[in-house]
């Protein structure tokens, strides 16, 4: 059995060649070079150089083609034989009214063809039955042993195959009883292929492609049973008798005789039985016309259904019908109920007269044995491919091809392995069960559709790149017409041979086993797409392949002897290899060539969508194969594509245009052809044919000069007849022309026998011209006549070979090598002579040795050409030999004078030739020079050398020839270098070590290294470092012993220098500690004064504001500080960095700065007061309008005016104060109507630059500063600020202690006590508790507090009607009280007000918090009416802030509840209550408050706890860290002490940084 498809074994790979660019330039030359290797495989693959990538020149939009349809399992020869066999056996049963059903055995379709062949091979049916060898038959069919399969096969053979075989043999059929068996598997109904009718069948649509297009449909096994009683078998009755022996079909109870009506009555009605796809059976009785229409519908219906007809039995009671029929066997008409009518010839037979007899009247169509035999013996038609009806473009074909492949393999096309496609292809072509149909755009003419290569046809302009590829020899339009190609001598454009064909393939599309026309070469180039798989067989095995295929499929070759020339037959390579045929394979990828050699069978298939181009070409070595091909065609009677004789004669007519190799090959072929022509014409004369006439055969159409016997195209001669002018024969078939007399026949010839030798002679002259030239070259190279030729004569011979285009033979190569060698000798000799003339200035490395000079002279003497430079070389050799004698004498008398040795050495260098003695002289000179250099370097008077110099001397000494003096000097030098490197390493360790050494250690190392007579860089660096350390120590002593403590900048500079020194310094550790302490103090001071992320430095905050008088400068510099662009530490007081080191200068400058700051703020107040108020309805924008920190002009409600600079700002852009110290009054808190105690004081961020700590905190910093042994600019500025604050505090206390002010304070205290004593209701209203997350909830109270106050008329405001319930009731109460507020509470005389206002101004300029400041502020507030606009603005801002706090509180509550729901731990209620307070403000002030708490922790609680109220200034919110206690009980300001936290609402505007 043949190999299965699943175990397909790929054949070995064919040779693959990768030519270099030099080899690639000559296509036919390279192919001739690889031919000895590649020809043994039949095909080969060539990969061009990577840069050779021709553009695709096809016009894609206009390219349209109609492909061929290929059914894969009809391509393979053995599969087609099986299908033909099944079609014939199916026809056999069909004409007997049965349909072929192929049974299943062991779950696979029974191979009826193989079963039939094996039965024949085993001796036939009778012999197998006799010997009981059906088990052996099952074994040969690869069925497993046991299971009684042999008996099953016998039953199927008897039922299906044996009747057909008996009919084929012409013997009478014998009765074969069916053996009953129980078969569980179902038979498959066979649908005939009708292979001969393929060309007339409409192609299937590609949208019906399926991976497994099953041809075989299951059908139940017929059995003998009463059909009428069994409804299932009644359904099966529609299939007729089935593929059984006659008499074994289904038997119905109603057996009626069919008769023919001689008188021509109307045809009986027929029953059309249709099995629909749903499984229902429909029986219709129709008229003949309707029946014909139904048959037409069946032929065009696409539905998968089965239809057949059954004739109804004629009524046997009709006497006319009975008398009309007689049996053809017994010639009787009795028993007409058992008389059968043949549907083919209308003859009648008794069912019992047939052999074998039939038990009943069969249903359906029945034909007699004579008709069955005639139908089965009909010869099959030739097989070929049919054309598709759809026309494709490249895009539409590609879409179809890719879709088919992706659907078939169920994966993307580029991911399908080539091995899988190959195995699946051979499985499909070997499969009878599966029909897979593909399309192949093959043999598309490039002349009509355009080539894939650029072509110079003047139809369009080509780019330079396209022009290069259009003229390339590898362009398939150019290769067939190259000069070395034979086809260039054929004028006609032979499509497919001279003109390329195009191939557009899809997966599984195949090209079958074939050889090229006239056994020519072929070359195929894959332009793009997926690979193409090739199989090849060498020419030596071509006949073997043909024999194997004929042996395996004789049925095909019997009807079509030239089947392999039709390109329609495949055979599995494994099958061929198993029969000894050598097969190779390859995968041709895009951009690769595949070449097939003469008479090399090849086939293959495409892996997917691709585009290829192919053409034939013929070289000189093809001519013998072409002649043999004509003889082969003559035997097969196959038409020729062109006349081989005509081609030879046309090349012989112009021998000078032929390549020499081609001329020699043509001469050889021409000679054979002339000899054969002589023989044939002589045979013609012997037959008595003497008439002849000249005929220009090349002018006749090919079909008019073809031999009517062998179809060969005639050219040299042909035999014709006067009486039969329609035909002629070649001289090989002179007896097959006609039956006419020889006297009526005549010879038609192209050349006479005298002209042919003349043409042959011209070829010989052209071919032998090479021999004449070769003899001349041979004589010259071998000096056969004893005379050497000159170079000019040899060059002339080489030029002749080039001009006459002689082949690149071995002799020509010898001539070229001789010329090349002679010219090299001449050039070398001239260089030797010119080198002597150049003397010591010649190029180094060009000298030759004495031995080389002698060999060179011998080489020149041995060359077969004469050169006059030989005499010059001999003269140089004599000079060198004389010099050698002198040198030997000088070396023998050592020690000689150094001057003598040097002069001899220079003379030898002028010769241009190296003499062995010269090297010895050179060594002696080098030794003397090196020793002198060592002495000079180590001399005591010499300057110290470096380590590099010493190493260089050692390296140079290593190359000096050894001697006692040299060895001693080298040892001393090495010892000194070792010592020096050791000390250098010590110094390096000292410089690089992490643990620095003290100066004493370094001094010891330096002192010991002074005795080494070598310059040591690390020792020198160590000296410099030690000197710097001493200078640094001196600077430290100087600065520590000065009149004042050293400045921090100086100490930092010294520390930086000291750290860089590689010396261990005790003073450095002390300085680092002092600097660290100073930095710690400055950091602590910064945390005390500076806000978080402040744009000011500590020094700027501590010093008076230098820009207080200029609003624009102050604002612009503040913006620059916000952006980090402005730094002015050294410009604060107008002092330079050096002046800042003098304490006196700092104090003087600070005093001057105080005065300038005061003058500046007064000027700024006047300027800002002149600006229009944003609250005024008539305010208009002008150049003097106030601008907020956000960069916009504040306008309308929400604007606040700074109490210091009098400028206006948005309330939402700055930190604003709270009106009340606490939203829940207590018995000890201030009365609600004491509006002068409300915290309404506002300082803008430009005026309040720091946290403004309390004076007690500053004093603690000063105490720490006194302990520092370092001077800081910030420390001195802090001292000045403290003195300024204490001075102001003293003046403020003095003013508050005056008689007038004391009286005013007393009256204000009485008013406060009166308001405090206001009686409360007995049952104050209570309010629902606020949520735990409410940011307004404070303290531990559960209910809302009592709210009390006093209206102007003394009425109580604590009634429920006057108090708003719920959250925010304090703000609503304040809002309701605003219309009732009147003032002033005190009458403040101008004499008293003016000093207080001036003090208030100076106090606001201080960056320190003082209680006296707040006392003066409350007194001034009580002395004027309440600022209703500011109070309303503050109320609105606080309401907005509380609304945001409630939203945040609700979010926190929801988050806490989600945690509880998830099973997590809830948040601490106290923490939840306090959390909203900490997030009250999202601006920088909230972060500052948190930082103050951290500062308090870091300072260790230096200030008092935050239990006592502090002043109500805006800075108190910044000072919640509680660094110092409030002076609540000292001085007259105690009654006015309250806690007034600031309020900050985030501004929706962009910050100044973003605005800028």
Curated annotation (Swiss-Prot):
Where in this chain does the record put each JmjN domain?
14-55
Biased composition range(s): Basic and acidic residues:
273-283, 1335-1345, 1461-1478
Q: Which Pfam families match?
A: ARID, JmjC, JmjN, KDM5_C-hel, PHD, PLU-1, zf-C5HC2
Give the position of the cross-link Glycyl lysine isopeptide (Lys-Gly) (interchain with G-Cter in SUMO2).
205, 229, 244, 274, 295, 1127
| Subcellular location, record wording | Nucleus
| Annotated positions of the Phosphoserine modification | 287, 301, 317, 893, 897, 1359
* Compositionally biased residues, Acidic residues: 1485-1500
Q: Which ranges carry the ARID domain?
A: 79-169
Instruction: Provide the alphabetized UniProt keywords.
Output: Biological rhythms, Chromatin regulator, Dioxygenase, Iron, Isopeptide bond, Metal-binding, Nucleus, Oxidoreductase, Phosphoprotein, Repeat, Repressor, Transcription, Transcription regulation, Ubl conjugation, Zinc, Zinc-finger
The record's catalysed reaction(s) read: N(6),N(6),N(6)-trimethyl-L-lysyl(4)-[histone H3] + 3 2-oxoglutarate + 3 O2 = L-lysyl(4)-[histone H3] + 3 formaldehyde + 3 succinate + 3 CO2
Q: Where is the JmjC domain?
A: 468-634
Cofactor(s) this protein requires: Fe(2+)
- Which amino acids does the record list as binding Fe cation? 514, 517, 602
Tell me a GO biological process for this protein. Answer: rhythmic process
Q: Which residue windows does the record flag with biased composition (Basic residues)?
A: 1445-1460
Q: What is its main location?
A: nucleus
**Ranges annotated as biased composition (Polar residues):** 197-207, 1513-1522, 1530-1540
- Cofactor binding summary note: Binds 1 Fe(2+) ion per subunit.
Q: Which SUPFAM superfamilies match?
A: ARID-like, Clavaminate synthase-like, FYVE/PHD zinc finger
Give the residue ranges for region: Disordered: 197-227, 257-303, 1315-1362, 1441-1556
General function of this protein? Histone demethylase that specifically demethylates 'Lys-4' of histone H3, thereby playing a central role in histone code. Does not demethylate histone H3 'Lys-9', H3 'Lys-27', H3 'Lys-36', H3 'Lys-79' or H4 'Lys-20'. Demethylates trimethylated and dimethylated but not monomethylated H3 'Lys-4'. Participates in transcriptional repression of neuronal genes by recruiting histone deacetylases and REST at neuron-restrictive silencer elements. Represses the CLOCK-BMAL1 heterodimer-mediated transcriptional activation of the core clock component PER2.
The protein's assembly and partners = Part of two distinct complexes, one containing E2F6, and the other containing REST. Interacts with ZMYND8.
Query: What does the entry's domain section say?
Result: The first PHD-type zinc finger domain recognizes and binds H3-K9Me3. Both the JmjC domain and the JmjN domain are required for enzymatic activity.
Q: Which family does it belong to?
A: Belongs to the JARID1 histone demethylase family.
The entry's protein name is: Lysine-specific demethylase 5C
Species whose genome carries this gene: Canis lupus familiaris
């Amino acid at each position: 059995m043949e190999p299965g498809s699943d175990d397909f074994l790929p054949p070995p790979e064919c040779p693959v060649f990768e030519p270099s660019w030099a080899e690639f330039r000559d296509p036919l030359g390279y192919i001739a070079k690889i031919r000895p290797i590649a020809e043994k495989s039949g095909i080969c693959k060539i990969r061009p150089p990577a840069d050779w990538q021709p553009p695709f020149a096809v016009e894609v939009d206009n390219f349209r083609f109609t492909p061929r349809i290929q059914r894969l399992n009809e391509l393979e020869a053995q599969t087609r034989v099986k299908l033909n066999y099944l079609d014939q056996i199916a026809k056999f049963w069909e004409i007997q009214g049965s349909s072929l059903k192929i049974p299943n055995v062991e779950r696979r379709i029974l191979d009826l063809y193989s079963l039939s062949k094996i039965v024949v091979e085993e001796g036939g049916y009778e012999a197998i039955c006799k010997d009981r060898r059906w088990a052996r038959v099952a074994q040969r069919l690869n069925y497993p042993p046991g299971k009684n399969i042999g008996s099953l096969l016998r039953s199927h053979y008897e039922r299906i195959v044996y009747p057909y075989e008996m009919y084929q043999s012409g013997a009478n059929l014998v009765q074969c009883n069916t053996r009953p068996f129980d078969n569980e598997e179902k038979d498959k109904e066979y649908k005939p292929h009708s292979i001969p009718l393929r060309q007339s069948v409409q192609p299937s649509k590609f949208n019906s492609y399926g991976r497994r297009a099953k041809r075989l449909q299951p059908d139940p096994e017929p059995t003998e049973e009463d059909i009428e009683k069994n409804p299932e078998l009644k359904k099966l009755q529609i299939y007729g008798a089935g593929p059984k022996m006659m008499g074994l079909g289904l038997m119905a109870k109603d057996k009626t005789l069919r008769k023919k009506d001689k008188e021509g009555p109307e045809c009986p009605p027929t029953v059309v039985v249709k099995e629909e796809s749903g499984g229902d059976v429909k029986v219709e009785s129709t008229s003949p016309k309707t029946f014909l229409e139904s048959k037409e519908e069946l032929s065009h219906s696409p539905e998968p259904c089965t239809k057949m007809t059954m004739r109804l039995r004629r009524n046997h009671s009709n006497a006319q019908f009975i008398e009309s029929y007689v049996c053809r066997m017994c010639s009787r008409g009795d028993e007409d109920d058992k008389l059968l009518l043949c549907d083919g010839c209308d003859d009648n037979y008794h069912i019992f007269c047939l052999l074998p007899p039939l038990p009943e009247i069969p249903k359906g169509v029945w034909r007699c044995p004579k008709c069955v035999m005639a139908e089965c013996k009909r010869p099959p038609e030739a097989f070929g491919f049919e054309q598709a009806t759809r026309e494709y473009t490249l895009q539409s074909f590609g879409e179809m091809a890719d879709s088919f492949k992706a659907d078939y393999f169920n994966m993307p096309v580029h991911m399908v392995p080539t091995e899988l496609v190959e195995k699946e292809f051979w499985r499909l072509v070997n499969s009878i069960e599966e029909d897979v149909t593909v399309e192949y755009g093959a043999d598309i003419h490039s002349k009509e559709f355009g080539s894939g290569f650029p072509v110079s046809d003047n139809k369009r302009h080509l780019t330079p790149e396209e022009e290069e590829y259009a003229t390339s020899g590898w362009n398939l339009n150019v290769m067939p017409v190259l000069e070395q190609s034979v086809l260039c001598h054929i004028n006609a454009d032979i499509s497919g041979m001279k003109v390329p064909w195009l191939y557009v393939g899809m997966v599984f599309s195949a090209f079958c086993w074939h050889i090229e026309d006239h056994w020519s070469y072929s070359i195929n180039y894959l332009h793009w797409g997926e690979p193409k798989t090739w199989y090849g067989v060498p020419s030596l095995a071509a006949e073997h392949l043909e024999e194997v295929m004929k042996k395996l499929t004789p049925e095909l070759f019997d009807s079509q002897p030239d089947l392999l020339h039709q390109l329609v037959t495949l055979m599995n390579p494994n099958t061929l290899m198993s029969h000894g045929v050598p097969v190779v394979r390859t995968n041709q990828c895009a951009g690769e060539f595949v070449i097939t050699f003469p008479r090399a069978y090849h086939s293959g298939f495409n892996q997917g969508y691709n585009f290829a181009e192919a053409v034939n070409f013929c070289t000189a070595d093809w001519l013998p194969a072409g002649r043999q091909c004509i003889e082969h065609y003559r035997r097969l009677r196959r038409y020729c594509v062109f006349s081989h004789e005509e081609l030879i004669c046309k090349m012989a007519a112009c021998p000078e245009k032929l390549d020499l190799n081609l001329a020699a090959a043509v001469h050889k072929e021409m000679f054979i052809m002339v000899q054969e022509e002589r023989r044939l014409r002589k045979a013609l004369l012997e037959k008595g044919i003497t008439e002849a006439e000249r005929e220009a055969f090349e002018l006749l159409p090919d079909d008019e000069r073809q031999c009517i016997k062998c179809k060969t195209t005639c050219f040299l001669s042909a035999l014709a007849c006067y009486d039969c002018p329609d035909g002629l024969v070649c001289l090989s078939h002179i007896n097959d022309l006609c039956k006419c007399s020889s006297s009526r026949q005549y010879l038609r010839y192209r050349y006479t026998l005298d002209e042919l030798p003349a043409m042959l002679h011209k070829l010989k002259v052209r071919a032998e011209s090479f021999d004449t030239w070769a003899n001349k070259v041979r004589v010259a190279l071998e000096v056969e006549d004893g005379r050497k030729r000159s170079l000019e004569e040899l060059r002339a011979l080489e030029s002749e070979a080039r001009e006459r285009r002689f082949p690149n033979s071995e002799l020509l190569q010898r001539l070229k090598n001789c010329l090349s060698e002679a010219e090299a000798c001449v050039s070398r000799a001239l260089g030797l002579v010119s080198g002597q003339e150049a003397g010591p200035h010649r190029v180094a490395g060009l000298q030759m040795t004495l031995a080389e000079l002698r060999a060179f002279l011998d080489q020149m003497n041995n060359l077969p050409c004469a050169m006059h430079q030989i005499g010059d070389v001999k003269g140089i050799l004599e000079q060198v030999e004389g010099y050698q004698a002198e040198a030997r004498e000088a070396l023998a008398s050592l020690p000689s004078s150094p001057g003598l040795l040097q002069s001899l050495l220079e003379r030898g260098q002028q010769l241009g030739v190296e003499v062995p003695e010269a090297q010895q002289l050179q060594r002696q000179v080098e030794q003397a020079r090196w020793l002198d250099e060592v002495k000079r370097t180590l001399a005591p008077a010499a300057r110290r050398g470096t380590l590099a110099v010493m190493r260089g001397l050692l390296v140079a000494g290593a190359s000096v020839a050894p001697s006692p003096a040299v060895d001693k000097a080298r040892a001393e030098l090495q010892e000194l270098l070792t010592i020096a490197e050791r000390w250098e390493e010590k110094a390096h360790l000292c410089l690089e070590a992490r643990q620095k050494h003290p100066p004493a250690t370094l001094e010891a190392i330096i002192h010991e290294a002074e005795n080494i007579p070598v310059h040591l860089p690390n020792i020198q660096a160590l000296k410099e470092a030690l000197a710097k350390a001493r200078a640094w120590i001196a600077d430290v002593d100087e600065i520590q012993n000065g009149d004042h403590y050293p400045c921090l900048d100086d100490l930092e500079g010294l520390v930086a220098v000291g750290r860089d020194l590689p010396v261990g310094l005790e003073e450095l550790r002390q300085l680092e500690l002092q600097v660290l302490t100073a930095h710690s103090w400055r950091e602590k001071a910064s945390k005390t004064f500076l806000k978080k992320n402040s744009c000011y430095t500590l020094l700027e905050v501590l010093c008076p504001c230098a820009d207080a008088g200029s609003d624009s400068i102050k604002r612009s510099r503040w913006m620059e500080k916000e952006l980090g662009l402005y730094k002015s530490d050294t410009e604060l007081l107008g002092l330079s960095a050096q002046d800042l080191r003098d304490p006196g200068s700092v104090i003087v400058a600070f005093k001057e700065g105080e005065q300038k700051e005061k003058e500046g703020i007064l000027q700024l107040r006047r300027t800002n007061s002149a600006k229009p108020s944003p609250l005024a309805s008539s305010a208009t924008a002008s150049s003097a309008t106030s601008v907020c920190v956000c960069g916009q002009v504040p306008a309308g409600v929400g604007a606040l005016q700074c109490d210091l600079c009098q400028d206006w700002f948005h309330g939402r852009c700055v930190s604003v104060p709270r009106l009340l110290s606490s939203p829940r009054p207590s018995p000890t808190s201030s009365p609600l109507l004491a509006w002068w105690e409300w915290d309404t004081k506002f300082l803008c961020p430009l005026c309040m630059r720091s946290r403004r700590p309390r004076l007690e905190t500053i004093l603690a910093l000063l105490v720490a500063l006194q302990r520092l042994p370092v001077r800081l600019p910030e420390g001195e500025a802090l001292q000045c600020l403290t003195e300024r604050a204490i001075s102001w505090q003293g003046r403020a206390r003095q003013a508050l202690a005056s008689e007038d002010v004391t009286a005013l304070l007393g009256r204000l205290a009485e008013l406060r006590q009166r308001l405090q004593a206001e009686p409360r209701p007995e049952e104050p209203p209570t309010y629902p508790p606020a949520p735990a997350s409410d940011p307004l909830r404070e303290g531990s109270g559960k209910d809302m507090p009592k709210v009390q106050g006093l209206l102007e008329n003394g009425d109580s405001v604590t009634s429920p009607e006057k108090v708003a319930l719920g959250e925010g009731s304090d703000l609503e109460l304040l809002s309701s009280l605003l219309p009732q507020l009147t003032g002033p509470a005190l009458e403040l005389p101008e004499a008293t007000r003016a000093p207080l206002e001036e003090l208030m101004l100076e106090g606001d300029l201080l960056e320190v918090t003082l209680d006296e400041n707040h006392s003066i502020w409350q007194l001034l507030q009580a002395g004027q009416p309440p600022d209703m606009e500011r109070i309303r603005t503050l109320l609105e801002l606080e309401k907005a802030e509380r609304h945001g706090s409630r939203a945040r509180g609700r979010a926190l509550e929801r988050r806490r509840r989600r945690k509880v729901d998830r099973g997590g731990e809830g948040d601490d209620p106290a923490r939840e209550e306090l959390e909203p307070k900490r997030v009250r403000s999202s601006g920088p002030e909230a972060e500052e408050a948190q930082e103050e708490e951290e500062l308090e922790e870091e300072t260790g609680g230096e200030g008092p706890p935050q239990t006592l109220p502090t002043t109500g200034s805006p800075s108190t919110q910044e000072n919640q860290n509680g660094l110092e206690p409030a002076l609540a009980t000292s001085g007259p300001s105690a009654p006015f002490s309250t806690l007034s936290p600031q309020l900050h609402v985030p501004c929706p505007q962009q910050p100044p940084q973003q605005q800028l």
